Amino acid sequence: MSVPFDPASYDRQLEEKTVRLRELLAPFDAPEPQVFDSPREHYRLRAEFRLWREDQKRYYAMFAPGDNRTPILLEGLPIASERINALMPVLRERWEASPTLNHKLFQVDFLTTLAGDAMITMCYHRPLDAEWQAAAEQLAAELNVSLIGRSKGQKLIIGQDYVTEKLDVAGRTFSYRQPEGAFTQPNGTVNGKMLNWAFDALGERQDDLLELYCGNGNFTLPLATRVRKVLATEISKTSVNAALSNLDDNGVDNVTLVRLSAEELTEALNEVRPFRRLHGVDLKSYDFGSVFVDPPRAGMDPDTCELTRRFERILYISCNPETLAANIAQLHDTHRVERCALFDQFPYTHHMESGVLLVRR
């Protein structure tokens, strides 16, 4: 659910979110949450637009939730990065001037980074040929972007099919490949604040870390520098490949990444059954003191929640405070909330990103 874009009301909206998080965590005697705000505009590093034809022209369009028939036609998007806003009108001029680029184009996606990279994905209801490739190569060079052309069963890459982000955590710069089509944190500034909070909350450890739902290694890279070694899990092939590249690019060599779900890992740790994907991984060699979880909106399922109970410290990043509270309630008899935080990843919506550190009683 969204609320109107109104920078003048930002502080009030953030306070309302803070009150809501405070209320949800009150039953667990949680400390006052640290609050990390967002830039008021140009904070979103990615944007996806359908194209809407009107008066023989195509316009960028978005739709209100639940209404895919009434387009909101856009010249720019104030919540999107300055780079996206600069690219939008130029790209539209170019496709309007080029029948090859324009023909059966129905969607345009932008992905940018704080480090200055940009990638545009153009989606078509037709096969893409050599003529399109030549026009796209010229366009990519002119705009200084990577360009992806997509149609059914086809993906043409001009440049690279990822962008590179650089984020500073505790004085060290980490480089992240963010692949086209994979999940990335949309608010880069707040993501940097989350990484630094998690790094500080975990602290310097002499034991090992288990990470569930590691994605492209967003948290894995900085947290790996705080522990002896890390076992990280992820099920998306695209994210696994990106995470492996990111570990290599940053010289992080104490992480083992396995393609298992949280449920499968629970079975492996409980020795319910062996997994071929764990071949060569000696689970008994790990001395896990902490677990890091960043689950989907549904939160942790009961079995995964029980798995985390066996760890002294649970570092939990949540995109849904209601399911976070439900998971804490399940763990509250053995773990207390030592730290909590609100990260305003999504200004002008009711969505909240939050974090807690749970420590065994």
UniProtKB/Swiss-Prot annotation:
PANTHER family: TRNA/TMRNA (URACIL-C(5))-METHYLTRANSFERASE, TRNA_TMRNA (URACIL-C(5))-METHYLTRANSFERASE. Keywords: Methyltransferase, S-adenosyl-L-methionine, Transferase, tRNA processing. It is an enzyme of class 2 (transferase). HAMAP family: RNA_methyltr_TrmA. The keyword Transferase applies. The active site is at residues 319, 353. It comes from Pseudomonas savastanoi pv. phaseolicola (strain 1448A / Race 6). It catalyses: uridine(54) in tRNA + S-adenosyl-L-methionine = 5-methyluridine(54) in tRNA + S-adenosyl-L-homocysteine + H(+); uridine(341) in tmRNA + S-adenosyl-L-methionine = 5-methyluridine(341) in tmRNA + S-adenosyl-L-homocysteine + H(+). GO terms for molecular function: rRNA binding; tRNA (uracil(54)-C5)-methyltransferase activity, S-adenosyl methionine-dependent; tRNA binding. Its EC number is 2.1.1.-, 2.1.1.35. This is tRNA/tmRNA (uracil-C(5))-methyltransferase. Dual-specificity methyltransferase that catalyzes the formation of 5-methyluridine at position 54 (m5U54) in all tRNAs, and that of position 341 (m5U341) in tmRNA (transfer-mRNA). GO terms for cellular component: cytosol. CDD domains: AdoMet_MTases.
